[in-house]
Structure formats: structure tokens, C-alpha cells
């Protein structure tokens, strides 16, 4: 349908169409025939509809006379480049009058003004999140800074040393019975197979407590497994001590006690961090195992004394490391829940030191 037919109304005078888009040429067109009013040239838009005027309008300032409409009509004055006019309307225009302006002062960058200050008690105040409930980590039984609390640390140390004292008491009693009671000493010497049974029980208990973290923290099963390990290892130590001279056993117990107390006190007082040497100690254990295999094939009293001396020195270093892990004031530390694991480490260190010292004394007296 052509542009002219879209504006035809039967028996009525029609106003001229609006001009086209700005920026393009304004072709002249002949006025409509028979029209009593002058027509303005226009350029059709791409969609067949008249565009919005921008720039000076060619129409008369008084608007289009529409018969019975008031002379004021709807003015179609020139539009400013910025958009719609904001000035006051003529008397015959809209009854609202001039549009109200924004209460904020004009801002050249178009940014709104800052919001007025709010009441601190309002939920939208800036300090609302600072006054909220504490975080989840503040309500834990063992927060991230639990080692800073001396009471927790001291309670953990007391529990570990209490368990260790009970273990050493059982072992010392077993060694005393196997050393001073002749009937028991004769029985264990004749039944060597009991040593291998106790060694198998000890090995299984050691693997369970060392590798199963959830199990060794589960009460009371952790204490049950630790008790089984203590009894089996005590039987092994007592059986080994029964093959040595009574004087050698007493000397080994005394030297072990002195060495352990000295190392523990030194580890508590020194500033040197032994926990940073764990990797070196693990490599040394591998070397010591290879040395032990060599001693099996090469039967030499001197070689066995050297092997026992290196083993005693190595587990003395392990005792220092485990003591500092217990104290928790170095690079590495144990959790307060690991009291069974801490007691196990200290106990095995002391027993190995005793066995190596007993080997040194026994081989030296031969």
C-alpha cells in the first residue's frame, strides 16, 4: 500500500505527514491536490512510516489547524538535539503544565548523588556483617589456633606421658620377670616359636595404628589396639633380654633411662627444629635396614656393634623429633586427638634404643 493511501480518511481534511529521518536529502514533493493547507515535503522511512523530526521544523509555529480544535493545539516546535523539549507548554497544551525537574542538582556525568546517611541500627548499614553471628570455625572444639592455648597443649602432653608411663611399666615388669625368674627364662628359651607369634601380633597392631587414622582416633578401640601392641612387644623384649646376662640387662635399662630423659629435656629447651629433619631420618632408616641385611650374611662382632651403635643414634634422633611433634612449637606438630599415635611413637623409640644398647653391651662383654 502506498504512503499516500495510508493517510486517507473519507470526507476529512488530513494533515501533512511528518518529515523523514535527519541527515538525508529532503526531496520536494508536490502538495496533495485539493488540500486547503500547504504540505511539507517528506522522505519515507525504510519501513514505510514517517520518521521523527530532528532539527528545525518547516511547519508553522502555530501548529496544524484542525477545525474545531483550539488554536493552541499540540505544538510541533523544533526539537533540540538532546531529545524531547523540557520547556513550558502553551496555554492550550497539556493541563499538567511544565514537567517537574529532578530534585538532584544537575550532574555533568549523569551519576546520581550519594545516599543519605543511614541509621546504624538499620539492617542495611555497613557494619551489619561485622556484628553477625560468629563463623563455623569459631565454634569448633579444636579451632585452628588451638596450639596457642596452653591448657589444651598441657592436657595433651599429660595424657600422652600417662599412656607412655603405663606402657613402659608393663614392659619393664615383663623384662624383670623374664630376667630374674629362672623358670620363665627357661620356658621362653625352649619355646622360641612364641617369639614369632608375638612378633606377628605386634606387626599387625603397628600397621593398624600407623596407617588407619580414623581407627586410632576412635575410643576405646584405639586403646585396645595399643594395649595389644604393648603386651606383644613387651613379650618380645622380655624374651630377647632372657638371652643376655642379668648385669647387661640392668645396665641397658639404666643407660636407656638416662638417654631418654636427656633427649626429652633437650628437645623441650633447644631452639633447633628437629622436625625439619624427618626426611633425612627416613632415608637413614632405609640405610640401616640394608646394613642389617649385610650383618646377617657377614657374622662379625665388630660389625654388629657398629650396627647397634648406628641404630641407637638414629632412634635417639627419632625420639627428639617425636618429642617436638608432641610439644607442637616447631614446624610440624601433632593434633590433640592423636595422643595414641604420639604415645606409640615415643614408646617404640624408647624400646628400640633399649634393644640397641643391650646389643652393644652384650656383644662388648662376649
UniProtKB/Swiss-Prot annotation:
Which residue windows are transmembrane per the record? 160-180, 192-212, 223-243, 248-268, 278-298, 302-322, 341-361
* Any one GO molecular function term: calcium channel activity
| Membrane topology annotation | Multi-pass membrane protein
In which compartments does the protein localize?
A: Membrane
Q: Which GO terms describe its biological process?
A: apoptotic signaling pathway; negative regulation of extrinsic apoptotic signaling pathway via death domain receptors; negative regulation of neuron apoptotic process
Give me the stretches of Pro residues compositional bias: 14-44, 67-109
What UniProt keywords apply to this chain's record, in alphabetical order?
Answer: Membrane, Transmembrane, Transmembrane helix
The record's Gene Ontology cellular component field reads:
endoplasmic reticulum; Golgi apparatus; membrane
Matching entries from Pfam families are given as: Bax1-I
Disordered: annotated segments: 1-141
> CDD domains, alphabetically?
LFG_like (cd10428)
What job does the chain carry out? Answer: Potential apoptotic regulator.
The UniProt similarity line reads: Belongs to the BI1 family. LFG subfamily.
Protein name listed in UniProt? Protein lifeguard 1
List the taxonomic lineage.
Eukaryota, Metazoa, Chordata, Craniata, Vertebrata
Gene that this polypeptide is encoded by: GRINA
Amino acid at each position: 500500500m502506498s504512503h499516500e493511501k495510508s493517510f486517507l480518511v473519507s470526507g476529512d481534511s488530513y494533515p501533512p505527514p511528518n518529515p523523514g529521518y535527519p541527515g538525508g536529502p529532503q526531496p520536494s514533493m508536490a502538495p496533495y491536490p485539493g488540500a486547503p493547507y500547504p504540505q511539507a515535503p517528506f522522505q519515507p522511512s525504510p519501513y514505510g512510516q514517517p520518521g521523527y523530526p530532528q532539527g528545525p521544523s518547516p511547519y508553522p509555529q502555530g501548529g496544524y489547524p484542525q477545525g474545531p480544535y483550539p488554536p493552541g493545539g499540540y505544538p510541533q516546535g523544533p526539537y533540540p538535539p538532546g531529545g524531547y523539549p523540557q520547556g513550558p507548554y502553551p496555554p492550550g497544551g497539556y493541563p499538567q503544565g511544565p514537567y517537574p525537574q529532578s530534585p538532584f542538582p544537575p550532574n555533568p556525568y549523569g551519576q546520581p548523588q550519594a545516599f543519605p546517611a543511614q541509621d546504624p541500627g538499620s539492617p542495611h548499614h555497613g557494619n551489619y556483617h561485622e556484628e553477625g553471628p560468629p563463623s563455623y570455625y569459631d565454634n569448633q572444639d579444636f579451632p585452628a589456633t588451638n596450639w596457642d592455648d596452653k591448657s589444651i597443649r598441657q592436657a595433651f602432653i599429660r595424657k600422652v606421658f600417662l599412656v607412655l608411663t603405663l606402657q613402659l611399666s608393663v614392659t619393664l615388669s615383663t623384662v624383670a620377670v623374664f630376667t630374674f625368674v629362672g623358670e620363665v627364662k627357661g620356658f621362653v628359651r625352649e619355646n622360641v616359636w612364641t617369639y614369632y607369634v608375638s612378633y606377628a601380633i605386634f606387626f599387625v597392631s603397628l600397621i593398624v595404628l600407623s596407617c588407619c587414622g580414623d581407627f586410632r582416633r576412635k575410643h576405646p578401640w584405639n586403646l585396645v589396639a595399643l594395649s595389644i601392641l604393648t603386651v606383644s612387644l613387651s613379650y618380645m623384649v622380655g624374651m630377647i633380654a632372657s638371652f643376655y646376662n642379668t648385669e647387661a640387662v640392668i645396665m641397658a635399662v639404666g643407660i636407656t633411662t638416662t638417654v631418654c630423659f636427656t633427649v626429652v629435656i633437650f628437645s623441650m629447651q633447644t631452639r633447633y627444629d628437629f622436625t625439619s629433619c624427618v626426611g633425612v631420618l627416613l632415608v637413614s632408616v632405609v640405610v640401616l635396614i640394608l646394613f642389617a641385611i649385610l650383618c646377617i650374611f657377614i657374622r662379625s662382632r665388630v660389625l654388629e656393634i657398629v650396627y647397634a651403635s648406628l641404630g641407637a643414634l638414629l632412634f635417639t634422633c627419632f625420639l627428639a623429633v617425636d618429642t617436638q611433634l608432641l610439644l607442637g612449637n616447631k614446624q610440624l606438630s601433632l593434633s590433640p586427638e592423636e595422643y595414641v599415635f604420639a604415645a606409640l611413637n615415643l614408646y617404640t623409640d624408647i624400646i628400640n634404643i633399649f634393644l640397641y644398647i643391650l646389643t652393644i653391651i652384650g656383644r662388648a662383654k662376649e
